[in-house]
């Protein structure tokens, strides 16, 4: 038995492809995104993993990614909890805008600050710090107890909600986490110690 947590960012979405701010909007996966999600499941299967429970967000791109992974593992009916606590960072007034159009409207420097600062939210939206303030407590109270019971847990979510988890798990500073890119459909496998600290981390890239 092992205390195993697997994090996967959803496969490429239609809006990733169009370079739009997505946030809590709900576009579907591209053909490539479906393939990325299935490939993630295949890599997890090759690694010999089976899950006891899965968590995902309230957004379909993460839910479909989660389902593809479970299908590839032969676990299509596994208990899966969907919760908006794991949703992507809310980009507020930027949601649905092309990133170049946003730069034209607010200026390149301001948009860069909204995208790449830790604690400055866009109008009507969340900063990465705000995102972490909902994601990390949900992890501690809901997900981590399963892992510490020596279960294997899947979390299929989003770039920034997963960044918030990785920042806390890895003990990173805001500056360090902002430099971390999470590729779509690439599983990250954490093994935890009994005291909830990280024993090992492995990235299952193609």
Curated annotation (Swiss-Prot):
Enzyme class: isomerase
Annotated pathway: Carbohydrate degradation; glycolysis; pyruvate from D-glyceraldehyde 3-phosphate: step 3/5
A Pfam family of this chain: His_Phos_1
Disulfide bond residue pairs: none
Alphabetical list of InterPro entries matching this protein: His_Pase_superF_clade-1 (IPR013078), His_PPase_superfam (IPR029033), PG/BPGM_mutase_AS (IPR001345), Phosphogly_mut1 (IPR005952)
E.C. designation(s): 5.4.2.11
CDD domains referenced in this protein's UniProt entry, alphabetically: HP_PGM_like
Entry keywords, A to Z: Gluconeogenesis, Glycolysis, Isomerase
Gene Ontology process terms (BP): gluconeogenesis; glycolytic process
List of residues binding substrate: 9-16, 22-23, 61, 88-91, 99, 115-116, 159-160
An example Gene Ontology molecular-function term: phosphoglycerate mutase activity
Record's catalysed reaction(s): (2R)-2-phosphoglycerate = (2R)-3-phosphoglycerate
Site-annotated residues for Transition state stabilizer: 158
Catalytic site positions: 10, 88
Entry annotated with the keyword Isomerase: yes
Function in brief: Catalyzes the interconversion of 2-phosphoglycerate and 3-phosphoglycerate.
Family of this protein: Belongs to the phosphoglycerate mutase family. BPG-dependent PGAM subfamily.
Quaternary organization: Homodimer.
Protein name as annotated: 2,3-bisphosphoglycerate-dependent phosphoglycerate mutase
Organism whose genome encodes this protein: Brucella canis (strain ATCC 23365 / NCTC 10854 / RM-666)
